[in-house]
């Protein structure tokens, strides 16, 4: 489906039926284009395939500044939601699209939830469950390990190139938002696992296709999609019997939280995550502060005696 043609037809429809300013039309275009870019990054190629979870993840990342570069204000959130609702009403009425995953979302103030993350023990339980004799399991373990080691977005992981990895130095070059590059180091276990995947799994998938530079591939040798990585993470959490629903961004949250828990400088974490705005990274300090408060409340004798 050609997303851009649908957007152009939507904007023409808006211009016909409304008398709003050019600024209003530009706001519609900007809001919807950002959403369409998110769909493309996640290899979602049809409006019918967009789920409520996709929309929820999109607004979570938009709200927290992962998309757009800075955390969203209440008024900006309301405008973005209104734009997408108008766009989907147009799709339903004029383009034969039956799905409307935006309908259930409400405007008003944003309830800022702290990022969900795994504890270190939960992460290790999930990582250590994989059978490293099976090529698919090797690949899946390597995907999750690399995302956790480097704090990658799912689209960054899916697009990771072999040529961007310096195994000797333990660095990889990530192509992030707006094609901005950043260098991220990884720990020795991650290095060993990448080498193990390259030597024992990737070639199995590449037997019938021409060699290319994308690191992670599906069983047909084609570049793996962000949606496939999402499903891999969900299944890994279920197989590890973790009590929470796992999604790729939770692994990125875990990276940031564990780094700050262990004394990493906030600005270094900002750089590693590829955040333009320090405020986007600061939300993780609230997570660590809440955890510290819980420890004090549970362990300090004066806190315990006050209960």
Please report, for each region that a protein language model flagged, where it lies by residue.
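Conserved catalytic core of the tyrosine transesterase superfamily
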Residues: 1-307
């Amino acid at each position: 489906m050609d997303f851009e043609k649908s957007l152009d037809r939507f904007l023409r429809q808006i211009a016909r039926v409304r008398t709003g300013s050019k600024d209003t039309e530009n706001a519609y275009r900007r809001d919807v284009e950002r959403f369409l870019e998110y769909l493309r990054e996640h290899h979602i190629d049809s409006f019918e395939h967009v789920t409520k979870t996709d929309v929820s993840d999109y607004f979570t990342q938009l709200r927290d500044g992962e998309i757009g570069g800075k955390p969203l204000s209440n008024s900006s959130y309301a405008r973005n939601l209104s734009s997408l609702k108008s766009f989907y009403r147009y799709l339903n009425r004029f383009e034969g699209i039956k799905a409307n995953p935006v309908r259930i979302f409400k405007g008003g103030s944003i309830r800022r939830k702290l990022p969900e993350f795994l504890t270190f023990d939960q992460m290790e339980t999930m990582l250590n469950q994989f059978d490293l004799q099976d090529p698919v399991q090797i690949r899946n373990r390597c995907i999750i390990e690399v995302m956790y080691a480097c704090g990658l977005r799912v689209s960054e992981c899916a697009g990771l190139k072999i040529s961007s990895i310096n195994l000797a130095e333990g660095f990889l070059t990530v192509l992030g938002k707006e094609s901005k590059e950043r260098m991220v180091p990884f720990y020795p276990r991650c290095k060993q696992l990448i080498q193990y995947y390259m030597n024992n799994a990737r070639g199995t998938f590449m037997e019938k296709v021409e060699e290319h530079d994308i690191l992670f591939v599906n069983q047909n040798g084609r570049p793996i999609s962000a949606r496939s990585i999402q499903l891999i993470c969900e299944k890994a959490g279920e197989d590890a019997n973790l009590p929470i629903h796992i999604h790729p961004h939770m692994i990125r949250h875990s990276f940031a939280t564990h780094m700050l828990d262990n004394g990493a400088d906030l600005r270094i974490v900002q750089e590693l995550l590829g955040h333009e705005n320090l405020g986007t990274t600061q939300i993780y300090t609230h997570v660590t502060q809440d955890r510290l408060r819980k420890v004090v409340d549970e362990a300090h004798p004066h806190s315990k005696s006050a209960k």
